[in-house]
C-alpha cells in the first residue's frame, strides 16, 4: 500500500484539539444513547415483527442527523480552540492521484474488515444474547435514504470517532494504541441499539478503522471504506 503524500496530509497536532468539557459533553451524550439504545434493542426483540415504513424512515433520518450533527459539534469544539476542519480530517484530496491512492488503500482494507466482521459474527453467535432483527431497505425512498445514511456514517462517524475522539484519547493517555482501542470501544457501544452481540462485533471493527487512520494520518481512506461497508452490509448484500 502506498504511503500518504506529505502534500495532502496534515500532521496531527499534539495535545487536545478541543476543550475537555467539550469531549465530556459528547461522552455524556453517548452514555445516554447507549442506555436508551439498549432499551430500544430489548423492545425490538420483544416485538419481533416487521418494522413499519414510517418507523424505518424515521430511524434513517435520525441516523443522518446524528452523523452530520455530531460531526458539526466536534468541529465546533475544535473551532473554539482555534483549530480547523483539517485538524479533524487530516487534509483533503488535491488531485486524482491522491483519490486513487486512497481508493487503493480502502479496497484491501474493506476486504480485511469484511473477513473480521464474519469471524466476529461466528464467535458472537455462540453467545446466548438477543439481537434486534434487521430489516433491509426496500423501494426507491428507503434505498435513497439508506445511501444517505451510509454517506453520513462514512463522513460523520469517521470525524466523530477517529478524527475527534481518537485524537482526544491520544492526548489524554499519551498512547496512540490506547486511543485506537478506546475510540473503538465507544464506537461499538454506540451500536447498543442493535443488541449486545452487535456491540461485540462492531467494537473490533471500530478499532480496525482507528488503526487505518493512525497509519494513514487522515480520514480519507477510512471514510471511503466505512461508507462502502455500510452500503454493502445494509443493502447491497441483500439484493
Spans of model-derived segments:
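Residue-level signature of transmembrane alpha-helical entry/exit and packing/kink sites
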Residues: 19-25, 55-63, 98-102, 142-146, ...
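N-terminal, membrane-interfacial amphipathic/helix-forming hydrophobic leader that caps
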Residues: 1-96, 118, 122-123, 234-239
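Acidic (Asp/Glu-rich) catalytic motifs at the cytosolic membrane interface
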Residues: 154-162
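Membrane-helix interface segments
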Residues: 95-99, 139-143, 172-178, 195-196, ...
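Membrane-interfacial alpha-helical segments at the cytosolic side of multi-pass membrane proteins
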Residues: 163-173, 235-238
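Functionally important transmembrane alpha-helices
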Residues: 31, 36-40, 177-190, 194-239
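Juxtamembrane helix-loop-helix connectors linking adjacent transmembrane helices
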Residues: 45-60, 83-153, 171
Amino acid at each position: 500500500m502506498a504511503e500518504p503524500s506529505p502534500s495532502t496530509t496534515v500532521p496531527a497536532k499534539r495535545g487536545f484539539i478541543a476543550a475537555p468539557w467539550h469531549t465530556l459533553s459528547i461522552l455524556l451524550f453517548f452514555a445516554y444513547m447507549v442506555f436508551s439504545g439498549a432499551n430500544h434493542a430489548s423492545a425490538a426483540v420483544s416485538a419481533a415483527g416487521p418494522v413499519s415504513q414510517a418507523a424505518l424512515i424515521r430511524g434513517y433520518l435520525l441516523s443522518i442527523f446524528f452523523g452530520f450533527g455530531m460531526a458539526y459539534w466536534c468541529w465546533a469544539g475544535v473551532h473554539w480552540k482555534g483549530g480547523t476542519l483539517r485538524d479533524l480530517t487530516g487534509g483533503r484530496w488535491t488531485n486524482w492521484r491522491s483519490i486513487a491512492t486512497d481508493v487503493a488503500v480502502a479496497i484491501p482494507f474493506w476486504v480485511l474488515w469484511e473477513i473480521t466482521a464474519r469471524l466476529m459474527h461466528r464467535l458472537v453467535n455462540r453467545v446466548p444474547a438477543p439481537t434486534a432483527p434487521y430489516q433491509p431497505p426496500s423501494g426507491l425512498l428507503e434505498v435513497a435514504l439508506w445511501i444517505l445514511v451510509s454517506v453520513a456514517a462514512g463522513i460523520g462517524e469517521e470525524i466523530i470517532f477517529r478524527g475527534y475522539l481518537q485524537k482526544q484519547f491520544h492526548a489524554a493517555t499519551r498512547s496512540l494504541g490506547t486511543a485506537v482501542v478506546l475510540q473503538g470501544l465507544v464506537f461499538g457501544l454506540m451500536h447498543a441499539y442493535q443488541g449486545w452481540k452487535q456491540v461485540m462485533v462492531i467494537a473490533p471493527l471500530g478499532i480496525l478503522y482507528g488503526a487505518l487512520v493512525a497509519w494513514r494520518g487522515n480520514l480519507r481512506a477510512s471514510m471511503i471504506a466505512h461508507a462502502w461497508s455500510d452500503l454493502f452490509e445494509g443493502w447491497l448484500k441483500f439484493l
